[in-house]
Amino acid sequence: MTERSDRDVSPALTVGEGDIDVSLRPRSLREFIGQPRVREQLQLVIEGAKNRGGTPDHILLSGPPGLGKTSLAMIIAAELGSSLRVTSGPALERAGDLAAMLSNLVEHDVLFIDEIHRIARPAEEMLYLAMEDFRVDVVVGKGPGATSIPLEVAPFTLVGATTRSGALTGPLRDRFGFTAHMDFYEPAELERVLARSAGILGIELGADAGAEIARRSRGTPRIANRLLRRVRDFAEVRADGVITRDVAKAALEVYDVDELGLDRLDRAVLSALTRSFGGGPVGVSTLAVAVGEEAATVEEVCEPFLVRAGMVARTPRGRVATALAWTHLGMTPPVGASQPGLFE
């Protein structure tokens, strides 16, 4: 399941957001904000390959959605002066789909496969040989009369992106020469992202307003940029177009994003967990019924951030509200309420 894209605090792209997202993408490692260790490592990989006149090792980018994996893939191709071919794991259902794409590559091309953990097994097995030996074996015919025809593939660099690195098979993961994990952003880094985006979009953003938006953005640049556009709309309609801290706070209140970045659904989960079930433990299915959502939505959409924020703890018996959750809802934690990290 992918995260619902109708929430302002969803890290997934919303419908119609792609074109805006592209306009804000950095074009080089120098422009890319945040992830300093990953940027330094990629710079070495890229410069080393350019000095040798060859192709870099295959690169795996892992981490939560909305942190810039696709942007980095585009930057890698640009820094290498190579063409970028883009596809996704779900689009590669058959080995023939992958063979057709590989056969069209030219030397030094960068092939980007998003959600690579969702690639179908037949295509994945073909990818092994292409990554290792730059060739594929295409099977022609069926049954005893089938024959395998080897096809050469131009030397290329595969950049794979995944939000679930643990879902990759061992053989596929082992064929990546370089793996980088991307972490959530610090508020100060998001302030820089917002300042850059505001400049591109022609938005007058006060420094304190940027800080207000940044701390509600769940450590995710995509969410920060989305909230910036929401606040811009509010500023243009109900203020003088200038985004001050007060304007940002008023706008985000309208859009139901609180000071920690929680929205209505997040607070509904916390409210049910505390008010209806006394803080837990309670199973995900029961919790989902209480908030009128599917269990997968609660587990995959709400829970990761609530756990990371220290408001919900996973235990063998179910989910438990921490003292921070009670406090955030304006209630006094009961005696014995768990502290963040107790069950981690």
Curated annotation (Swiss-Prot):
Binding site for ATP: 24-25, 66, 69-71, 132-134, 175, 185, 222
Keyword Lipid metabolism: no
Keyword Transferase applies: no
Subcellular location(s) of the protein: Cytoplasm
UniProt: Mg(2+) binding residues: 70
Catalytic activity: ATP + H2O = ADP + phosphate + H(+)
Cellular component terms per the entry's GO annotation: cytoplasm; Holliday junction resolvase complex
Keywords linked to the UniProt accession: ATP-binding, Cytoplasm, DNA damage, DNA recombination, DNA repair, DNA-binding, Hydrolase, Nucleotide-binding
Chain segments carrying region Large ATPase domain (RuvB-L): 1-185
A GO biological process held by the record: DNA recombination
Annotated spans, Small ATPAse domain (RuvB-S): 186-256
Binding site for DNA: 314, 319
Residue ranges, annotated region (Head domain (RuvB-H)): 259-344
Gene3D superfamilies the record matches: 1.10.8.60, P-loop containing nucleotide triphosphate hydrolases (3.40.50.300), Winged helix-like DNA-binding domain superfamily/Winged helix DNA-binding domain (1.10.10.10)
SUPFAM superfamilies listed in its UniProt record: P-loop containing nucleoside triphosphate hydrolases, Winged helix' DNA-binding domain
GO molecular function: ATP binding; ATP hydrolysis activity; four-way junction DNA binding; four-way junction helicase activity
Domains as described in the record: Has 3 domains, the large (RuvB-L) and small ATPase (RuvB-S) domains and the C-terminal head (RuvB-H) domain. The head domain binds DNA, while the ATPase domains jointly bind ATP, ADP or are empty depending on the state of the subunit in the translocation cycle. During a single DNA translocation step the structure of each domain remains the same, but their relative positions change.
NCBIfam families with a match to the protein in the record: PRK00080.1, ruvB
Family, as annotated: Belongs to the RuvB family.
Assembly and interaction partners: Homohexamer. Forms an RuvA(8)-RuvB(12)-Holliday junction (HJ) complex. HJ DNA is sandwiched between 2 RuvA tetramers; dsDNA enters through RuvA and exits via RuvB. An RuvB hexamer assembles on each DNA strand where it exits the tetramer. Each RuvB hexamer is contacted by two RuvA subunits (via domain III) on 2 adjacent RuvB subunits; this complex drives branch migration. In the full resolvosome a probable DNA-RuvA(4)-RuvB(12)-RuvC(2) complex forms which resolves the HJ.
Physiological role: The RuvA-RuvB-RuvC complex processes Holliday junction (HJ) DNA during genetic recombination and DNA repair, while the RuvA-RuvB complex plays an important role in the rescue of blocked DNA replication forks via replication fork reversal (RFR). RuvA specifically binds to HJ cruciform DNA, conferring on it an open structure. The RuvB hexamer acts as an ATP-dependent pump, pulling dsDNA into and through the RuvAB complex. RuvB forms 2 homohexamers on either side of HJ DNA bound by 1 or 2 RuvA tetramers; 4 subunits per hexamer contact DNA at a time.
Protein name: Holliday junction branch migration complex subunit RuvB
Name of the coding gene: ruvB
